[in-house]
C-alpha cells in the first residue's frame, strides 16, 4: 500500500513540537538584582537602570528605624535626606519602572541603627514605610511621589524578633507588594529565619559571601552548591545567588565570572526556585563589568 504523503506531512507537523518538548528541558532564565545607593561615585539610579543589566534595583538603605527612633534614609554621597533633596530620584525611579525594572527600598544594612522592640513597633514602622515610600500618603516622602515596588529586608544586626510582624504588616497593606530578603548563607539565618518561614517573601537573595562555610573558595564550589541546595527547601518562593561584584566588594566569596557561568549557574539553574543572581553592589559592578560578563548566562 502506498503511503499518503499529505497525511505524513500533517503528522510530522504535529509531532515536531512534541519532539522539542521531549528533548529540551524548559530554561530557568533569570535576572540580576543589584544594590544601589552606598557610593556616591556609582552614578545615578537612572544610570544603573540604563545599563539594561538589572531586573531589580534595591535602594540602600533605610538604616535607622524602630524603637522610637526617627527613620532615616542613608544614600551615602547621592543626596541628603535632612534637607529633602533626595526627591530628585523620584523621576529616576519612575524611569526605571518604565523599563520594567522593579525598584525596592532596602532596610537595614551592615552598619545601620535599627531594631523592632515589639509587634506594635513593627506595625508603626510598616505604617511609616507604606506612607512614605509605597502606596500611602505623607507630606514628607523622602524620595518624592514615586511609589516603590517593594521592600527588601537586609537585616544584619540585632535580634531576629518581629521581622515576621513587619512582613505581615507590609503585606497587609497590599498583598501584591514585593517582599525580598537578603539573609546570610548559614542556616538558620540569625536575623531573618522566622520572617522567611512565614512564606511571605517573594524572593530571597542569599548572601553567599563573607561566610566561608557556605561560599566559593579557591576553586571549590562544593560548599556553595551544598548550601544552595539546602536553601531550596526553605519557604522562599524564589532564590537568587548573592555574590560580590568584584574582589573589593566583600572580604571573601568572590566568584570569577567565568567560574560562575561555567561551574555554578549550570548546576543551580536546575532548581525550580532559581531566580537569578544578586550583586553587591552597583559601584563595584560598574568598576568590574561583572553583570555584563554574566548576563548572557543568568
Swiss-Prot record:
Residues 30-298 form the GH18 domain. CDD domains: GH18_hevamine_XipI_class_III. It is found in: Secreted, Extracellular space. Its EC number is 3.2.1.14. PROSITE patterns: GH18_1, GH18_2. It is an enzyme of class 3 (hydrolase). GO terms for cellular component: extracellular region. Keywords: Carbohydrate metabolism, Chitin degradation, Disulfide bond, Glycosidase, Hydrolase, Polysaccharide degradation, Secreted, Signal. Pfam families: Glyco_hydro_18. The active site is at residue 156. GO terms for biological process: chitin catabolic process; polysaccharide catabolic process. Induction: By ethylene. Residues 1-29 form the signal peptide. GO terms for molecular function: endochitinase activity. Its main location: secreted. It catalyses: Random endo-hydrolysis of N-acetyl-beta-D-glucosaminide (1->4)-beta-linkages in chitin and chitodextrins. Disulfide bonds join 49-96, 79-86, 185-214. Belongs to the glycosyl hydrolase 18 family. Chitinase class II subfamily. This protein functions as a defense against chitin containing fungal pathogens. PANTHER family: ACIDIC ENDOCHITINASE (PTHR45708:SF22), ENDOCHITINASE (PTHR45708). This is Acidic endochitinase.
